[in-house]
A protein has these predicted regions:
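Extended catalytic cores of very large enzyme megasubunits
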Residues: 1-237
Length: 237
């Protein structure tokens, strides 16, 4: 695909395998980044339209390009630079495995769009949680979902996944009080960051949607340094 030239995709080493969407599905040829496990190939086989060969760069770039064009056509992206900034952010998010949209966006089918962020992917090299990157990811997904909904969605479906993996990264039992505090803080951070971006969009285009996320009050502190403070700051923004 011509859209891959000159992007981050061009430097990604791929490996090819046969994978099916489920054990009973016929396998199809897929190509995923070389370090990724076979389960990622199965996920790509399930998400890619049709039943023929599929590569992650081409399949992802297809929906990214659709969003760029839609955003510009609707006036939700101010020109080529804004469109490319959105695209670059989405490419980086997919490659870092920090988040992905629902099947309706991958397949370009009718339906309410959704986006899920992968919590363990925001663990940083210092052994903490990269709250600024998470806030930025929330903002990017809100903008993406707004474009998917043609700027008319009454609510946006943004969520997070693998809380257990995040807790394991900090050695916290899933059923502990500390884990509950972390979950509440993550929910607060997610909602605050998403509402801040929704507010920015409302300032430019008029209020039209809310973030569909139940948010408990964040705790004063959590076992993850800085997380509770980041959640309170996001909710106060």
């Amino acid at each position: 695909m011509a859209g891959i030239v000159g992007t981050i995709w061009a430097g990604v080493a791929l490996r090819r395998l046969k994978a099916g969407a489920d054990p009973d599905a016929p396998p199809r040829a897929v190509a995923i980044p070389a370090p990724w496990e076979d389960e990622a190939g199965e996920a790509l086989a399930a998400l890619a339209p049709g039943g023929g060969p599929a590569t992650l760069p081409s399949v992802a770039e297809a929906w990214i390009q659709r969003l760029m064009l839609r955003g510009r056509r609707l006036g939700l992206l101010d020109g080529a630079d804004a469109a490319e900034s959105l695209a670059a952010g989405l490419r980086a998010m997919i490659l870092a495995r920090r988040g992905a949209p629902g099947a309706e966006i991958w397949r370009d089918t009718r339906g309410e769009g959704r986006f899920v962020l992968n919590l363990p992917a925001f663990l940083d090299g210092a052994g903490g949680f990269d709250a600024p990157a998470y806030r930025a990811a929330c903002a990017l997904t809100v903008q993406t979902l707004d474009i998917w909904g043609h700027g008319k969605a009454e609510s946006l479906r943004l969520g997070f996944a693998d809380l257990a993996g995040l807790l394991a990264g900090f050695g916290l039992p899933y059923d502990s009080h500390e884990a509950c505090d972390v979950a509440a803080a993550i929910a607060g951070l997610t909602r605050g960051a998403a509402e801040a971006e929704s507010g920015r969009l409302a300032t430019r285009f008029g209020a039209r949607h809310a973030v569909a996320l139940i948010c408990p009050t964040p705790p004063e502190e959590t076992a993850i340094p800085g997380l509770a403070k980041a959640a309170r700051a996001a909710l106060a923004a």
